[in-house]
UniProtKB/Swiss-Prot annotation:
Compartments where found: Plastid, Chloroplast
PROSITE patterns: HOTDOG_ACOT
Principal localisation: plastid
Expression sites (tissue/organ): Mostly expressed at low levels in glandular trichomes (lupulin glands), and, to a lower extent, in stems, leaves, flowers and cones.
Gene: TE2
Protein name: Acyl-coenzyme A thioesterase 2, chloroplastic
Residue ranges of domain HotDog ACOT-type in the record: 89-211, 287-404
Lineage, uppermost ranks: Eukaryota, Viridiplantae, Streptophyta, Embryophyta, Tracheophyta
GO cellular component: chloroplast
GO molecular function, one term: fatty acyl-CoA hydrolase activity
Organism: Humulus lupulus (European hop)
Length: 437
C-alpha cells in the first residue's frame, strides 16, 4: 500500500503469533513475501498494531530505516487535508482468539498499557504520512513525541468485542503537529458514534531535520469540513494555552495564601514524624506509598530513529502507577485518566531508566468513587557520568473497582499527607493544575 491509498480502507490488526491450530502458509500463499517478516526488522517495538502499520506503510518506513545519504531536505511544503492522514485500525477481538489473548488483562478487559503503546505508534505513523513529501530523493524528517494531552477513559473496554481506533492530523504549527485518536467500541446495537467512544487522546509531535536536529517546517493543513475546522480551532487554542502555562509556571511563586496551604498540609505530617502513636490512622505519609522500578533500555524497544519510543515509556509508567495504586488501596484499582505528559528529554538505547512512583494525594469527597492520584517520575541515570535527569513526569488517576470494593464492608481509602515542604509543594502544584483544567 502506498501513500495514495484510501483512508477509507481500515488496517486490520492480527495476532503476532501463529495460531497453534493453523499450519504453515503454503508456498503459493499470496500473503507470503520474499521480504523479511516485519517482526524481524531491527529497531522497532513490535505489537499487532505496529506490525500492521509497518506492513501497510512499508515503502515509507523502509526509506526512513535507510535514508538516502547526503540527500537534500524537503524543498517545498505541501498542503494536505486531514482525510489524507486519517488512518483506521481494527482489532477483531471477537474472531481472533490469539489477538484477544495478547490484549486481555486479568479482569477480561483490554490492557490499557498495551493500548497506550499502540496509540503512540499510530500517532507516529499518521505524523509520518502527513509530513511525507512523496519524494524519495529528499531526506525524511525526524518526528518525535513532544507531549500527550489528557487521556480520559470514558467506559470500560472489553477484550471480547471488536475495537476500532481512528486517527488524523487535526492541527499543524510551524514544526509541530497534533494528532487526535479515538478508540471506539460498540456494545449496543443502534448506539450512536459518540456513545461508542471509549477513549480519546491527542498527541503532539515535533519535526526535526534528521541531519542538523534543528526544528524543521512541516506540511500545511487545510481543514475541509466544519468539524475539521472546529477541531483545528480547538487545537490552536490548546497550543496558545500551553504557551501561556509555560510562561505562568516560570513566574509562579508561592504567596501568603500558598504558605498557609503549605502549613495546613504539613501539620498532620509533622504529627506522623514527631508523635507517630498519635497520628491519624486514616492517613499515611506520602513517602510510605512509594514504589520503584528500574530497567536498562534495550535495542528492541527503540523506534526508527534509534530512541526509546514514547509509547514504551507510557506503558511502563502505567504499569508502575497501577501497582502503586493496588498496593496502596488494597483493592484492584480502576484506571480513569492520564494528565498532560511532556516528553522533556529523549531516552536512548542503553540508558538506565528509573521509574519512581507515589500516591500524591487522594480525593475522598465521593465515597462511591474515591480518587487516587499517582505521580510517576522517569529518571535517565548515567552511572559512568554520575548524572541523573528527569525525562518525564506522569500523573495517573485511579479509583477502585466497584466489584472489588463490594467485597469489603466499611472499606476506606486513606488520606495522604506530606512530611516535607517539597512534597507539600508538589501536591499543591498538582491540585492547582487539576483545578485549571
Amino acid at each position: 500500500m502506498d501513500l495514495s491509498s484510501s483512508p477509507n480502507h481500515p488496517i486490520t490488526v492480527v495476532s503476532t503469533f501463529a495460531s497453534p491450530f493453523e499450519g504453515p502458509p503454503s508456498v503459493g500463499d499470496s500473503n507470503s513475501s520474499a521480504r523479511k517478516p516485519i517482526s524481524l526488522w531491527p529497531g522497532m517495538y513490535h505489537s499487532p498494531v505496529t506490525n500492521a502499520l509497518w506492513e501497510a506503510r512499508c515503502k515509507i518506513f523502509e526509506r526512513l530505516l535507510d535514508p538516502p545519504k547526503d540527500a537534500p531536505p524537503q524543498s517545498e511544503l505541501l498542503t494536505k487535508t486531514p482525510s489524507q492522514s486519517r488512518t483506521t485500525i481494527l482489532y477483531n477481538f471477537s474472531t481472533d482468539y490469539i489477538l484477544r489473548e495478547q490484549y486481555r488483562d486479568p479482569w477480561n478487559e483490554v490492557r490499557i498499557g498495551k493500548l497506550l503503546e499502540d496509540l503512540d505508534a499510530l500517532a507516529g505513523t499518521i505524523s509520518v504520512k502527513h509530513c511525507s513529501d512523496d519524494d524519495s530523493t529528499t531526506r525524511p524528517l525526524l518526528l518525535v513525541t513532544a507531549s500527550v494531552d489528557k487521556i480520559v477513559l470514558k467506559k470500560p473496554i472489553s477484550v471480547d468485542i471488536d475495537l476500532k481506533i481512528v486517527g488524523a492530523v487535526i492541527w499543524v504549527g510551524r514544526s509541530s503537529i497534533e494528532i487526535q485518536l479515538e478508540v471506539s467500541q460498540s456494545t449496543k446495537e443502534g448506539s450512536n458514534a459518540a456513545d461508542d467512544v471509549a477513549l480519546s487522546a491527542n498527541f503532539i509531535f515535533v519535526a526535526r531535520d534528521s541531519k542538523t536536529a534543528k526544528a524543521a517546517p512541516v506540511n500545511r493543513l487545510s481543514p475541509e469540513t466544519e468539524q475539521e475546522k472546529l477541531l483545528f480551532d480547538e487545537a490552536e487554542a490548546r497550543s496558545s494555552m500551553r504557551k501561556r502555562k509555560r510562561g505562568d509556571q516560570e513566574r509562579r511563586e508561592f504567596e501568603n495564601g500558598e504558605a498557609n496551604r503549605l502549613q495546613t498540609l504539613l501539620a498532620e505530617g509533622r504529627i506522623f514524624c514527631d508523635m507517630p502513636a498519635l497520628a491519624d490512622r486514616d492517613s499515611i505519609l506520602l513517602r510510605d506509598t512509594r514504589q520503584e522500578n528500574s530497567l536498562i533500555c534495550q535495542p528492541q524497544q527503540r523506534n526508527i530513529h534509534g530512541r526509546i519510543f514514547g509509547g514504551f515509556l507510557l506503558h511502563r509508567a502505567f504499569e508502575l502507577a497501577f501497582s502503586t495504586a493496588y498496593a496502596f488501596a488494597g483493592l484492584v484499582p480502576y484506571f480513569l485518566e492520564i494528565d498532560h505528559v511532556d516528553f522533556x528529554r529523549p531516552v536512548d538505547v542503553g540508558d538506565f531508566l528509573r521509574l519512581k512512583s507515589c500516591v500524591l494525594y487522594t480525593e475522598l469527597h465521593n465515597p462511591d468513587q474515591p480518587l487516587i492520584n499517582i505521580e510517576v517520575v522517569a529518571h535517565v541515570t548515567r552511572p559512568e557520568l554520575r548524572s541523573s535527569e528527569v525525562s518525564n513526569t506522569f500523573y495517573f488517576t485511579f479509583t477502585v473497582r466497584p466489584e472489588a470494593k463490594a467485597t469489603k464492608n466499611g472499606y476506606r481509602i486513606r488520606n495522604v499527607v506530606p512530611a516535607t515542604e517539597e512534597e507539600a509543594r508538589r501536591i499543591l502544584e498538582r491540585m492547582d493544575a487539576e483545578a485549571c483544567i
